[in-house]
């Protein structure tokens, strides 16, 4: 099902459909430059270990795993196929851990662990999570190829990437978030640079999943005059505006993210410490029914309002204070970004709606009652953004990740990009 808001001109929409039947087969000069902002785990992440690093086992010794490193001792932390092997899963989890420092009121890496995001400004780290396993770890490859082939975009010229350390999240006003705030500064500079290198054209920001939350808050933290000059449109794919119920399973029992052979309990520890994972927990703004539990156990049930008790009962009481002070205020209001927005998401896919735990407790995987959504994010969350100049497109049967490669989904995304670029193509045609 497709829904388009009345804020868009009917005349323009009809003209676009009639005159652009071949989608957006434009030349590069007829497109607004586009920056991709990935979702959680949607780009490569590199690490190096210094003398302060204390391995949890001999398998995790820096001289043993990994053997091959880049110049300066850097190596890929995400994604690395060695995580599939049990002895190295723990090493991976140790190195992905974040620690909350109450004195700094901020998160930081484990001692001795330095991380960096490679290829900022390029799509290189978004195409594949592991270049050696391109088919198995393809992420935005199909989307980028479609933009090049169908819309005339040129990779790393009119289409760029804004990867980030997806473990970190933003914090509420008055609380520091050094890493994520630096990403917003880098993104702002990239937008300005991209516009300058493309004849001063404003930029389209195209996000997937968690990237949509970052873009929304990024736009909220800029001035109206800056947005008018530099931002043409915000296109959000599968954005979890109000979080997702499946994230409670991540905290309670661990989530392998579809990676085979991995024990979810081995990765649960670092997943709980991820600041961005807390950001993706179900919000009371969307999951506001106090009579409808999201997690059911023999002893107690939990709604979105009992997150502090949920944290304590799963054995993560240290997460209560930073969640309530830093993260929760971010989720309580979805502010208008001040630019035209197009939300594209799937529906009609079984999506966790209630997690039911038995006598085995949270170390066992739950039985799941399903509802509507994209398989990961619940429909209520996908549709939660209610702002001016909003265009909403729903695609039946498309999942949270397949929206980046499904043929029908890509066709719809290209169509929406063509609508945005249509005005520019007309102006250029008149001037020729």
Curated annotation (Swiss-Prot):
It is found in: Membrane. The gene is LCAT1. GO terms for cellular component: membrane; plant-type vacuole. InterPro entries: AB_hydrolase_fold, LACT/PDAT_acylTrfase. It is an enzyme of class 2 (transferase). One of its GO terms (molecular function) is O-acyltransferase activity. The active site is at residues 209, 374, 400. Keywords: Acyltransferase, Membrane, Transferase, Transmembrane, Transmembrane helix. This is Lecithin-cholesterol acyltransferase-like 1. The keyword Hydrolase does not apply. The chain crosses the membrane at residues 7-29. Its EC number is 2.3.1.-. The keyword Acyltransferase applies. It is a single-pass membrane protein. Belongs to the AB hydrolase superfamily. Lipase family. Its main location: membrane. GO terms for biological process: lipid metabolic process.
